[in-house]
Amino acid sequence: MDIELFLSNYNIANGTSSTTANNSKFQPKIKVKLVVESGSSTYEKSLESTNDQLKPLIIKLNNKIKKYEESLNKKNFVTPNKQSSSSMNLLQKSSTVNLSSPSLSQIGLTHHASLKNLQITTSPDIQQPPSVPSNPIVFGISLDTLIAKEKSMELRIPTFVSNILNTLFLHSLGVEGLFRISGSQMEIQNRRGIVNLGDYSTSRDDNPHVLTVLLKQFLRDLPEPICTNALYDLFLAASDQINFQQCKENGFEVLKKLINSNLPVNNRNLLQHLIHFLRFVAMNQTVNLMGPSNLSRVFGPNLFWKKETGPLDIQILQSTSEKVNFITEQMILHYDTLFEEPLQTTSPAVLSNTPINSNPASIPTFNFGGKKLVIHSKLLGHNKSIQWMTLCGSSNSNGNSELSGSRVWSLDSHGMARIWDSQNQQFIKEVEVVDQSKGGGGAVYQMISTTVNNTVWTATSQKLAIWDIDGGLIGEIPGESYSLCESQNKEIWVGGPQVLNIYSLDGIPSIAPSNCTSDDNNSNGAGGGELLKPIGTNLFMKGIIILAMCKVGQNRIWGCSSEKTLYVWDTKTKETIHQCEIQEKRPKRMACIEIDDTEYIWIGGDEGSIQIFNSKTFKLEHKILNQGWDKIFHIASINREIWIGFWDTTVRVFPGDPKNKEILIDYKGYHSDVVSSIIEVPNLKGGDPFVWFGSYDKSISIVSIKEDTAKSWNFTNIKKNFTRPIRQGFSSRG
């Protein structure tokens, strides 16, 4: 019998027998078996328990199997034969219609009235079946006709295009030769036939080169180009002006007017979606080798063309092609100034009836609490999942830190750290923190930067290492370290095996020895210079490993242990002033936030529950149970709010005040995997501040936060006697 029958019978039984369901002792035992048959051999594993305990596992396995079956069915499509109606009917019957991916404008935020009113967000990878239009053909149809026949008024570009852009955005920005390399012609023709039958769905399993060819074919098959026949010559004239220095500024004004005032609304929306996406591709040209110039050459001819009625002049054709490429390149390079935000994604009639505070934008811009989140950049380059990020600045003449020349370090699970310029988001260099050639490699636990001498500290299974902000190795202490925290007294507290090591920052230089730079030690973390080996004070904790720490108030450090114990230490006397049991199996994440002169410590871990403690009373103020989001991967305090990354790939923002139990926002869609690190980065140019998200999908997304002009942005983590944010000692990645 099918497993669906068991699930339906269970639901009926559960609805009529609540007393039994609530008492597992009276429930009959069931067994789940995994059987693998390979040749003549059979392998199996079984698990026995009650209905209630095993039902979530059964549902999860059943959903995964169904999803995989759909993927296999999708790959087994055949090319439809126009001369055979029977084969066409067979194809229609066997096609599996999946959910179309949401557009970048619809990715992932669900506002909440309270925790009690949970709403289900749709993952970009989990798609619901769309209703197939009566005439589902996509290729060769005018843009206005195509959009008019789609029932949804929220999305003002074709669903087929939106799905391709989102799948490429989530999974393929780093693919070498994106839009330049072609896919298999047979696969392209198969997929084109499927699309014209109404299946517009895409997934991470799709060949990105097939998707890019389909997108270019769609644009070339339009009866009229996106930039229209009527405006073709005007766009080329704007290209000439921009290319001529004396009238360059006027040329950009002409181009901006052509885009925002002269183009039909549907054409403008689609053009902005496309250029917006190409901008993200170009940002990662060091990885995909597709910069603005290369992209303009392969994409420009799909945006601009004009049907010639007479014989072609090769010289004129070459000159025109150069202008088309140039104007496309300029749109990619100057996207932010040429395109008006927000992009209109609803019809004018619908837009006029929407509330003033709504924001129907195609670029993901999300409003909450008087703020607007807008994606600014997406950075690639890591080959493994990102575990930690930290912001560090440069030291001034007094030895204090300042943000000028600041860096962001991102550290992946393979022990490779990439260093970025925090302001222009440009990659600077890569440093090997863990020597993977030694003893099978090592594990990464935590990374922080200090506010006193602006050094970067990394805790791994091999050693505790100290770096300058540019990747020079200053010193190291052999042995495993799990958690890090900078105290209020110019010290670094390090959680090791059954011991707390405390190192003074006095005497530790902020710059590595000249003969021991990261260039000298990029293979094994050791150069020719004499490395510092600081000696610390030890607080022995028999049988205890501190998994997470954070500093609180003027002289407190709070920490959570592997034995589910919460500790509070006095940083001056080094004494334990409070100790209690915490109801969390593996408390690995901590953050502190100050609300109305009281500091609250937020703690989470593998169980997915959130516990909020009052720093004055040491009492549990509030507990938020796991609402189905599973493990907690990061907790950060940003602008009077708590930002938490969960296993379900969602970042949820909570008000810092535990009395307010609402979830302000569910932020999801810029990553295909868990967000494992969150940091705030001020904008030194005086613009909107940034939040950086590091993910297990090996990428970093950077969101700018536009604050309501009536309110002022408050950097929660800026230390009052310093000019830059401090680093929280969140936790180890044990």
UniProtKB/Swiss-Prot annotation:
PROSITE patterns the UniProt entry points to: RHOGAP (PS50238)
Broad class of the protein's primary localization: cytoplasm
Give the induction note. Answer: Down-regulated by phagocytic stimuli.
Q: Gene3D superfamilies in the record, alphabetically?
A: Rho GTPase activation protein, YVTN repeat-like/Quinoprotein amine dehydrogenase
Q: Which SUPFAM superfamilies match?
A: GTPase activation domain, GAP (SSF48350), Quinoprotein alcohol dehydrogenase-like (SSF50998)
Q: Where in the cell is it found?
A: Cytoplasm
Q: Where are the transmembrane segments?
A: none
Q: Where are the WD repeats?
A: 381-430, 539-579, 585-623
Site positions (Arginine finger) are R180
Please give the InterPro entries that the UniProt record associates with this protein: Quinoprotein_ADH-like_sf, Rho_GTPase_activation_prot, RhoGAP_dom, WD40/YVTN_repeat-like_dom_sf
Q: Which GO terms describe its biological process?
A: small GTPase-mediated signal transduction
Instruction: Output the Gene Ontology terms for molecular function.
Output: GTPase activator activity
Provide one Gene Ontology cellular component. Answer: cytoplasm
Q: Which residues form the Rho-GAP domain?
A: 141-339
Functional description taken from the UniProt entry = Rho GTPase-activating protein involved in the signal transduction pathway.
> Per its record, how is this protein called by name?
Rho GTPase-activating protein gacL
Organism of derivation: Dictyostelium discoideum
Provide the taxonomic classification: Eukaryota, Amoebozoa, Evosea, Eumycetozoa, Dictyostelia
